[in-house]
UniProtKB/Swiss-Prot annotation:
The chain crosses the membrane at residues 40-60. The gene is cdu1. The keyword Protease applies. Its main location: secreted. Signal peptide: none annotated. This is Deubiquitinase and deneddylase Dub1. One of its GO terms (biological process) is proteolysis. Effector proteins function to alter host cell physiology and promote bacterial survival in host tissues. This protease possesses deubiquitinating and deneddylating activities. It is an enzyme of class 3 (hydrolase). One of its GO terms (molecular function) is cysteine-type deubiquitinase activity. The lineage of its organism: Bacteria, Pseudomonadati, Chlamydiota, Chlamydiia, Chlamydiales. It is a single-pass membrane protein.
């Protein structure tokens, strides 16, 4: 048995090669070369087929628009430039189109509508020039708008009424000037000479909607003290001696309380501050005079507002005064147990067309009440506002003439009853 280490491999003797015979290529490298040639030919065929399909679907001018076509790339070496003649595309037919006319503008019927330009059928030019645009049709003329067209139509009667109202206001303001507290106090002093039962209460500082009730109660308390022979507890008037004031309280039967009102302030201190500011400016602003008559003899509270409801509605004011009348029955009871009644005098706006005649209207109403307290003189007022203020102007002129000789802020001397 032969061991593998000692075994001798038997090989065929290799004949000596002859250097004169050519060396033949083996079959395996030859097959690889054929495969490469076949692959290259197949790739070239696919490229040719693809380009052919592309040329079928796209024209040469479309191929030029692609970004990857005919692009120049920077190169260090100069390469020959191959110019391919490209046929120019045929120019499109230029068809003139009319421009869109502007939208119609609505104007007055008197202005005729703008004529619509006639549109001619498009014509094909033989040799159009692309650079020259087609002529545009003429535009329709725009209607000219005047200032009268922009303003809304207002009837002539409205202007006539506005002019008449403005003229009426100017006439009324010229007839009846605004009355301040000094003239009102002088008017009260003049009324005292005609009706001694009226006490000329000072109007500066005037009562307000916030303190007129306390002022009336204080005066009635002082009147009771004078009738008992006791000293008064309230404050004395600025321009009246204590003896003269006691005589006035003893013989008075009617208290004319003038109230100064402004709609802005909501407290007594704010009202006084507003009054000072308006006095410095010399303007009445939105201030208003009101009148409350306390008729002690007739046991009646009379409220007069020439603007009718400037402070509050007449119904609310009547309820407030009725509650106050019950309080006065306790403060100043009558010997026959008669209670105070309440009357709202104005049934409409009295001072139509005037904003500064409230003080004069309060004095006029007080004069009517003193003359006849049981006749309502407001029912006989003229309907026309100018005629109404003409009558008021006559009263104002008579009062201003009567108070010229009266001293400034000085109480008249009251006569002693006993």
């Amino acid at each position: 048995m032969l061991s593998p280490t000692n075994s001798i491999s038997k090989t065929a003797p290799v004949p000596p090669q002859d250097s004169s015979k050519p060396v033949l290529i083996s079959e395996e490298p030859q097959n690889q070369l054929l495969q490469k040639v076949a692959r290259t030919a197949l790739a070239v065929l696919l490229v040719v087929v693809t380009l052919g399909l592309i040329l079928l679907f796209y024209s040469f001018s479309d191929l030029q628009s692609f970004p990857w076509c005919c692009q120049t790339r920077p190169s260090t070496k100069e390469q020959p430039t191959i110019s391919i003649p490209v046929p120019l595309p045929s120019p499109p037919l230029a068809v003139p189109r009319p421009s869109t006319p502007p939208p119609p503008v609505i104007s007055r019927p008197s202005t005729p509508p703008a004529p619509t330009p006639a549109i001619s059928p498009p014509s094909t030019p033989s040799a159009p020039k692309p650079s020259t645009p087609p002529p545009l049709p003429p535009k329709a003329p725009k209607p000219v708008k005047t200032q009268e067209d922009l303003l809304p139509f207002v009837p002539e009667q409205v202007f006539v009424e506005m002019y008449e109202d403005m003229a009426r206001r100017r006439i009324i303001e010229a007839l009846v000037p605004a009355w301040d507290s000094d003239i009102i106090f002088k008017c009260l002093c003049y009324f005292h000479t005609l009706y001694p039962g009226l006490i000329p209460l000072e109007t500066f500082p005037p009562a307000t909607i916030f303190n007129f009730k306390q002022k009336i109660i204080s005066i009635l308390e002082d009147k009771k003290a004078v009738l008992r022979g006791e000293p008064i507890k309230g404050s004395l008037p600025i321009c009246c001696s204590e003896e003269n004031y006691r005589r006035h309280l003893q013989g008075t039967t009617l208290l004319p309380v003038f109230m100064w009102y402004h709609p802005t302030p909501k407290t007594l201190s704010d009202t006084m501050q507003t009054m000072k500011q308006l006095a410095i400016k010399g303007s009445v602003g939105a201030s208003h005079w009101l009148l409350v008559i306390v008729d002690i003899q007739a046991r009646r509270l009379v409220y007069f507002d020439s603007l009718y409801n400037y402070v509050m509605s007449p119904e609310d004011m009547k309820k407030d005064l009725q509650s106050f009348a019950q309080q006065l029955d306790q403060v100043y009871p009558a010997y026959d147990s008669q209670i105070f009644s309440v009357k709202i005098a104005a049934k409409e706006v009295i001072q139509k067309g005037s904003g500064s005649s409230c003080g004069a209207w309060c004095c006029q109403f007080l004069h009517w009440y003193l003359r006849d307290p049981f006749t309502d003189a407001l029912n006989d007022l003229p309907v026309d506002s100018v005629e109404r203020h003409e009558n008021l102007a006559s009263f104002v002129q008579a009062c201003e003439a009567a108070v010229q000789d009266l001293p400034e802020l000085f109480w008249p001397e009251a006569k002693a009853l006993f």
